[in-house]
Regions:
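C-terminal helical "tail/cap" subdomain of flavin- and related membrane-associated enzymes
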Residues: 50-116
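FAD/FMN-dependent oxidoreductases across multiple families
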Residues: 1-50, 54-73
Length: 116
């Protein structure tokens, strides 16, 4: 099935010094995952939990709190998605020791899942 946007794209709103009051970026506006990895909806659902927690602390400064916590959430699935892309030799990017380890681990996990 072809997808309209089949790439990984991350925006770092947590690094902004200012953000308009009353607005909040959420879901794919923070991070768009390649749909083949099936991570986008899961991350958006957990972002909803984070948003609820941030709203509980009051509306003042919510964007900064939310973006910081959402960024920490996104870090791991982002590393997995980008690392998975780097398994393909034609994809350009640095294949660090961490990326190679994550790819090795996920390959082992998939092989084990096929036998279980």
């Amino acid at each position: 099935m072809p997808y309209q946007f089949s790439a990984n794209l991350r925006r770092h709103y947590e690094e902004l010094s200012r953000f308009p009051e009353g607005f909040l970026a959420y879901g794919d506006a923070l991070c768009s995952f390649n749909p083949v990895y099936g991570q986008g909806m899961t991350v958006a659902c957990v972002e909803a939990v984070i948003l609820r927690e941030c709203l509980g602390a009051g509306a003042q400064g919510i964007a900064r709190r939310f973006f910081r916590k959402a960024s920490a959430l996104i870090d791991i699935p982002w590393q997995i998605a980008v690392g998975s892309d780097l398994q393909h030799p034609r994809v350009q990017g640095k294949r660090s020791a961490q990326v190679r380890f994550i790819n090795w681990y996920i390959a082992k996990l998939f092989r084990a899942a096929q036998r279980d």
